[in-house]
Amino acid sequence: MAVLKLTDQPPLVQAIFSGDPEEIRMLIHKTEDVNTLDSEKRTPLHVAAFLGDAEIIELLILSGARVNAKDNMWLTPLHRAVASRSEEAVQVLIKHSADVNARDKNWQTPLHVAAANKAVKCAEVIIPLLSSVNVSDRGGRTALHHAALNGHVEMVNLLLAKGANINAFDKKDRRALHWAAYMGHLDVVALLINHGAEVTCKDKKGYTPLHAAASNGQINVVKHLLNLGVEIDEINVYGNTALHIACYNGQDAVVNELIDYGANVNQPNNNGFTPLHFAAASTHGALCLELLVNNGADVNIQSKDGKSPLHMTAVHGRFTRSQTLIQNGGEIDCVDKDGNTPLHVAARYGHELLINTLITSGADTAKCGIHSMFPLHLAALNAHSDCCRKLLSSGFEIDTPDKFGRTCLHAAAAGGNVECIKLLQSSGADFHKKDKCGRTPLHYAAANCHFHCIETLVTTGANVNETDDWGRTALHYAAASDMDRNKTILGNAHDNSEELERARELKEKEATLCLEFLLQNDANPSIRDKEGYNSIHYAAAYGHRQCLELLLERTNSGFEESDSGATKSPLHLAAYNGHHQALEVLLQSLVDLDIRDEKGRTALDLAAFKGHTECVEALINQGASIFVKDNVTKRTPLHASVINGHTLCLRLLLEIADNPEAVDVKDAKGQTPLMLAVAYGHIDAVSLLLEKEANVDTVDILGCTALHRGIMTGHEECVQMLLEQEVSILCKDSRGRTPLHYAAARGHATWLSELLQMALSEEDCCFKDNQGYTPLHWACYNGNENCIEVLLEQKCFRKFIGNPFTPLHCAIINDHGNCASLLLGAIDSSIVSCRDDKGRTPLHAAAFADHVECLQLLLRHSAPVNAVDNSGKTALMMAAENGQAGAVDILVNSAQADLTVKDKDLNTPLHLACSKGHEKCALLILDKIQDESLINEKNNALQTPLHVAARNGLKVVVEELLAKGACVLAVDENASRSNGPRSTPGTAVQKEE
């Protein structure tokens, strides 16, 4: 809020401040605006209310001042009067209809303001006009919260007397008692508790009033609460007690009081941290730590991640506290979950004094920690040279590697502090040592662009052309130092984008310095790694323009030669990763811009595929061809740009194309850019291609148009754009399917309706594909009810045409009962008798698949139960042969299917059930057979059901057959033709037994 000069204000405002009613009357008489606004949108009435001058307020209101005017914080004159505790001003404003419920931007009413400012008399005037004193502000706080927060006992008394909810909570579930306890208002705390406030109440994070008082060091409130017998070790959601909170905030007086009252000094929180851990880490926790240690706190207790209090002092460099812990039995070489001792942690964070304390107390400098690293590794890695000096000791094997084979010199090279490197080298560190990947310290220094480290290592004899296990030299790593990673790291420290960019530029200059130094010291830029890439490839891949310029200048061999042996050229790598500046450097060399990678792709193809517009523009400006096809998919850069919807790249490519047919170029599958754009749903790309007059009716090798693909993939806006181009809707693919077939199959009812209207207006419209299936077949097969309704609105679909496996068959075979109902309702029940080319009815299909509900639906529409197909089988036979017990049950018991019907091989339903080993089906059929002759009925092989059941091991069925009079002496065809003993069902049964 700005502070305004009174002399700069209107005369009326100055007169109000001077308190002269006569001058005010004179100014008003001279038509001075009584509702004038200052820069904060405050009116003269706000001023008078602030001053509490009732007479002037009355005068202004009678002269037309708006009594409920709001400033830019939405404060009314009543808010101002209440804040000034002027009872008379409040009464005058209310007399003139001031809104007692008005809210400011924080949703605070005049009562909130009165409560916060101890305006008791004003509150007494306002409260009778309110429906409730428990109205909350934006933070959920009531007037009682504000009164308690500010310690106004009289106001708290008034509000409680007027019905304020003593346990009302704000949006963080904090009560008035929390706020009073936090602020140390003992009288208010006592008053609230005496009026029934819940002393053990918790907010959303589980903090009690005791936690609140302890956190802010309110010792008197803490004592009062403890005297009331509150649970001293009550925890919040993080498992922290009041003692934890007091230690964390360095409230030593509270800590002392809590300990005296018996608080558990070793209580762990959810992460296993005790109050001692917090005291060890806290900025002001030194005295707290002393108190805890002197009162029996376990100095070696470890958290869930293995950290002891000594570890915590090491993180934050609390060396005095570390001495206290050690003197009281703290284990110096205690390890955490990662294997780190306090010495490792202190080395990691560079706390030299603490390191000195630990070493003096006998800490093991050669103890292995995370990844088997020494404390010296961590100090060197984090560039703490003074710590390194402290950690070096006589007899220490300085070249001992960690888990990955890295020595301390490797760590120092990665950390970038040249003093660490010099210190280690002077102590005998071997710069020839390699890690498990074959990398020397020089590789690490180069990868992190630490120029002075590189300089020191090379000067002392490091081999600049030493290769690691992947064949990479320091030059490879310097050329590939990741600017994007460095940018991310820098971004955490710099919010300003300009500063961030400057930092990035400095880092790239440092990379160039490193590269230049290596080249000056005979680094060979033509050395290739095991994949055939040299330093130029790496610089291109990571977009280092200056490094590229330097390498190209220093490389005697031609640029094209550098590509041999590599799967991708530097041009490909720069284009793929979007490094247009690096690309521009490469383009200055006389190279073939259409050079291909191992898959035949050009740099332009890769740039277009990734959507790097600036790279695409640079390449086409230098003459790169947009028509080169790769070796695999035969796509062009046009196809590549469309696949991922990179419309800007596509536009650039189309604008450069001389040939108008470029827009319809095809890949190996015959797909045009338009087809791909539609298939992937890239609306802007589709719009651009149509604008460039792409052929909407071009077909691929499968005969599909863009419309086919759009409907298959379901991209609505793309399809709509194609339809607006008068695309052919009856064009058939290689299987004879039109877009209507696909719309019906995919359930796109809206498109289907639109396509139908267009199709029916054409004279020659054939709705059958190569197998005779119509859109209605496909809609029924896939259960698309909305599409079926659309199709049945057309007369031509209310009769079955095409493949004799009718739409009803299609619906039934996939258990789409609702679709079948639609067909039966729209046509008539006679369709239940239709047959496919094998003579099977829909009932056969239902029985075959055991779709019981569909079966019942067909039977309700008088489906012929005993109709036989071309092989003489009824629906019952079909169900029995396939073991569909549900269908058999309905057909036998409800539909009373004929059990005597025989197929071409004279098999009855019972024969078929037994032949496939379907015991349940056989028993269901047997239950309905009473005729002994049917039990002994023979098929073409002279086999009775008993033969078949016995041969298939159906013991229960055999027993039931015998019980119903099956003949055990019947002879089948095989037995009658043999010369040996006759085989009867009886012998088969005996074998089974």
From Swiss-Prot:
ANK repeats: 7-36, 40-69, 73-102, 106-135, 139-168, 172-201, 205-234, 238-267, 271-301, 305-334, 338-367, 371-400, 404-433, 437-466, 470-498, 531-561, 566-595, 599-628, 633-662, 669-698, 702-731, 735-764, 771-800, 803-832, 838-867, 871-901, 905-934, 941-970
Record keywords: ANK repeat, Repeat
Transmembrane segments: none
Classification via SMART domains: ANK
Function in brief: Putative regulatory subunit of protein phosphatase 6 (PP6) that may be involved in the recognition of phosphoprotein substrates.
Stored PANTHER family: ANKYRIN REPEAT AND PROTEIN KINASE DOMAIN-CONTAINING PROTEIN, SERINE_THREONINE-PROTEIN PHOSPHATASE 6 REGULATORY ANKYRIN REPEAT SUBUNIT A
Subunit structure: Protein phosphatase 6 (PP6) holoenzyme is proposed to be a heterotrimeric complex formed by the catalytic subunit, a SAPS domain-containing subunit (PP6R) and an ankyrin repeat-domain containing regulatory subunit (ARS). Interacts with PPP6R1.
Protein name per the record: Serine/threonine-protein phosphatase 6 regulatory ankyrin repeat subunit B
Organism: Homo sapiens
Lineage: Eukaryota, Metazoa, Chordata, Craniata, Vertebrata
Gene for this chain: ANKRD44
